[in-house]
Amino acid sequence: MAVSSARTLKGPRRFVRRVAHRANSPQWQFLRGFLKNPVMVGSVIPSSKVLIDKMLGPVRWDEVKLFVEYGPGVGTFTRPVLDRLPPDAKLIAIDTNPDFIEYLEKDIGDDRLIAVTGSAADVRKIIESHGFDHADYVLSGLPFSTLPPGVGAAIGEATANVIR
């Protein structure tokens, strides 16, 4: 009977291990962030590779010193930006969700990444606190259509004031 009980538990243990492993995946972190605050995440799934390549295609990477990303989430764009970013450049990723920032800091081991918990509306203060006076590029993953009234306009104005 003990052998039978051990076999019975083997299935659930395997399931628990599988779920625990997936709990740290980017997809799970993204979904959890969406379920926690759908207004601020704005999507159930991260962007596709095709979209990423189209968005990053026009960037003149050899001229970039500072790239800013709003709403990096689990790093769907962060990783490809870092793949293309020159060795002497920086990426400042700003997100209001501290869980996403913590995930990026743990998951991406790149000294060029500066992950900040904060609002994109404070981009001027954030980049200046890291020694920059302007950004060469700003990429936004923010769900502007679901942001509270006035926040989108404030972010737009702040962005216009820091972009080169």
What do the predicted segments below correspond to?
Residues A2-P26:
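N-terminal auxiliary segments of SAM/dcSAM-dependent transferases
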Residues Q29-D62:
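Class I SAM-dependent methyltransferase Rossmann-like catalytic core
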Residues E63-G73:
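Conserved class I S-adenosyl-L-methionine
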Residues V74-P86:
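Conserved SAM-binding loop of SAM-dependent methyltransferases across substrates and taxa
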Residues K90-D95:
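Conserved SAM-binding motif I beta-strand of class I
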Residues I101-F132:
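S-adenosyl-L-methionine
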Residues D136-G150:
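A short SAM/SAH-binding and catalytic strip from SAM-dependent methyltransferases
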Residues A153-R164:
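A short glycine-rich, Lys/Arg-flanked "PGG" loop and its adjoining helix->strand segment in the class I
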